[in-house]
Amino acid sequence: MKRPRALPTYAVSIFMAGDIETAKRHIRRCCYEDALCVTVTPTTFIYTAGEEAGFTVGFVNYPRFPRVPSRLRARAMKLARELMRECCQRSALVMDASRTDWLTLDPPALARSKSP
């Protein structure tokens, strides 16, 4: 029997509205190409004057695919930006134990309409 491997605990989460099936298709490709293991969980966002379905993506420092915290967070940030485009969303949150980043993106059509 192999000896269990242990790593320091570190987790990063992405929070985003949008279609979970679209997100899972993209995440599946990313995991296949980049040796990742993540969780994908449906969630509901309730906020002032509204409600939206979405999902969370959980990254953990999985011993099979170990990464230092800075690389794990960077990969979560990259995936969040990719998912914003794939799921046609304007924003996402990336959160770990010490920091939350709110990412925003103007859709290409909106960005073009702002140009002179």
Where do the language-model regions lie?
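Short, flexible N-terminal segments of the mature chain
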Residues: I20-T44
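A structural detector for beta-sheet-dominated domains
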Residues: F15-A17, T41, V60, M95
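Short, low-order "capping/linker" segments at domain edges
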Residues: E52-G58, D101-P116
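Short, conserved charged micro-motifs
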Residues: D19-I27, F65-L72
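Short, compact, well-ordered microdomains
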Residues: P66-A109
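Short, intrinsically disordered low-complexity segments
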Residues: L36-R73
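Short, flexible, solvent-exposed loop/turn segments with mixed acidic/basic and small polar residues
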Residues: M1-L7, Y47-A49
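Short glycine-/aliphatic-rich beta-strand segments at the starts of folded cytosolic domains
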Residues: A6-G18, T56
